[in-house]
């Protein structure tokens, strides 16, 4: 365990995130003057890193060694917090001998900097210099961020920010819960009797949105989860029939259904989606190594993945995404290489490459305690293997985001053929358009003209969502009252 003593609570989140990035295998705890006395008494003797803040700079003590920062000698045009993060990064880099690929950036949207600077008319060289010197981002990652930001800007030119919105519908059921998952999901076998009532509740929530957003342009629709294809064909048909009867789809640029788990996909369900003109689906293997699928509790076999993908092609889908996760338990570079080779053979239209994120609420934490974090192996080489596979397929990177506690401190990257980019994926990351979310555990984000964002969430519990659907609608009414 790494215990960090911070003299002021203002920067607790930033300090924790950056220290955790350097000490990925350790539990990191930050104590401040606001920490409860009993916890302070327990943890203070274990402090291994102490940060003392002052108006003129800061001092960091690591063991017996002190590191000093004189803020007055640095141009703090971007604020004290960023100056502190640079100082902390330099200190930890010196102590550990590590350089992080994304430098001191700890947020989920590292492309945001490049995007904003492009909007200001800055050149690639200026953006690269800023990211390298102000945030210590590697040249490779900085160039990737610039490349993706340019592509995002081009793709979003046709999107109606103020006069439009996107719609998300969450189906929180799965065949089983995967080891690494912390999303709202429930085993379909135990909830089968509630599914019809759940669909009824979603349609009721849908009615409110359809009635109150008639003056807005609907740009994208995304049905995710969970696993939407855990619904029976008749339930899928009822849900999407209601959706298309209530909303004007003539303006919709992308209609995605995350089919996801191969063990939930059937020809009949695919035919329902195709008949309703779903334009993009996902068939997500995560890995093509059967032993790993067994470990992570993903009951679909490699053969089922292949069958589901081929079925989707036979039915007529011409925009199929596949998701992979790097850093899964026990997987090495050779395993990733074999997975990528199989993906290249299948030739999907887009590929989303995730770095495993260790979520506090997932069963993966327990697995790590039993097997050790060293069994999670993600490296720069595995990232390059995946990128090379996408390039071999003729794909370009089009969106990128990061998560807390991500294996190898890398990123999630979406690759696609030109014309097959996932617009909703970009919109959810860039936070430039209102996204209205329906279903249990979903979060609606309202984006105001000045860039301000306000949210309202639906309860996660399926039974409570059904019971309190009127309250969920009231929450949306309050959010959009102005």
Spell out what each predicted region is:
Residues 1-120, 124, 202, 418-482:
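Radical SAM enzyme core and accessory elements
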Residues 147-148, 180, 257:
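Key residue(s) within conserved catalytic/signature motifs
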Residues 28-37, 41, 361-438:
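A C-terminal junction/extension of Radical SAM enzymes
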Residues 228, 405, 441-444:
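Short, glycine-/Ser/Thr-/acidic-enriched flexible segments
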């Amino acid at each position: 365990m790494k215990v960090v003593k911070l003299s002021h609570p203002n920067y607790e989140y930033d300090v924790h995130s950056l220290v955790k990035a350097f000490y990925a295998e350790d539990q990191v705890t930050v104590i401040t003057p606001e920490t409860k006395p009993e916890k302070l008494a327990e943890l203070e003797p274990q402090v291994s890193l102490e940060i003392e803040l002052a108006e003129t700079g800061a001092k960091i003590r690591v063991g017996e060694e002190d590191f000093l920062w004189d803020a007055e000698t640095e141009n703090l045009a971007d604020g004290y917090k960023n100056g502190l993060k640079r100082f902390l990064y330099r200190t930890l880099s010196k102590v550990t001998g590590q350089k992080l690929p994304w430098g001191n950036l700890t947020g989920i949207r590292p492309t945001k900097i490049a995007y904003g600077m492009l909007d200001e008319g800055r050149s690639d060289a200026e953006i690269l210099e800023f990211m390298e010197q102000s945030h210590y981002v590697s040249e490779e990652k900085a160039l990737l961020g610039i490349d993706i930001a340019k592509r995002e800007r081009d793709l979003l030119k046709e999107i109606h920010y103020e006069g439009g919105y996107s719609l998300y519908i969450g189906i929180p059921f799965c065949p089983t819960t995967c080891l690494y998952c912390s999303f709202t999901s429930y085993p379909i076998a135990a909830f089968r009797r509630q599914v019809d009532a759940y669909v009824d509740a979603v349609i009721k929530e849908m009615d409110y949105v359809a009635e109150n957003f008639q003056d807005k342009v609907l740009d994208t629709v995304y049905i995710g989860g969970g696993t939407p294809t855990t619904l029976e064909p008749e339930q899928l048909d009822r849900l999407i029939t209601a959706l298309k009867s209530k909303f004007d789809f003539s303006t919709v640029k992308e209609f995605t259904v995350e089919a996801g788990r191969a063990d939930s996909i059937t020809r009949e369900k695919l035919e329902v989606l195709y008949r309703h003109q779903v334009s993009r689906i996902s068939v997500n293997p995560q890995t093509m190594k059967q032993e790993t699928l067994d470990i992570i509790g993903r009951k679909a076999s490699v053969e089922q993945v292949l069958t589901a993908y081929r079925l989707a092609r036979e039915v007529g889908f011409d925009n199929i995404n596949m998701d992979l996760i790097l850093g899964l338990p026990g997987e090495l570079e050779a395993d990733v290489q074999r997975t990528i080779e199989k993906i290249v053979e299948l030739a999907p239209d887009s590929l989303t490459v995730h770095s495993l994120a260790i979520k506090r609420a997932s069963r993966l934490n327990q697995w790590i305690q039993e097997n050790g974090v060293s069994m999670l192996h993600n490296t720069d080489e595995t990232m390059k293997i995946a990128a090379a596979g996408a390039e071999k397929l003729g794909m370009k990177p089009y969106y990128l985001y990061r998560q807390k506690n991500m294996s190898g401190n890398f990123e999630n990257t979406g690759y696609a053929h030109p014309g097959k980019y996932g617009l909703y994926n970009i919109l959810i990351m860039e936070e430039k358009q209102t996204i209205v979310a329906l279903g249990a555990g979903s979060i609606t984000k309202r984006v105001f003209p000045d860039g301000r964002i306000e949210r309202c969430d639906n309860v996660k519990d399926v039974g409570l969502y059904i019971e309190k659907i009127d309250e969920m609608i009231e929450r949306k009414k309050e959010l959009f009252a102005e």
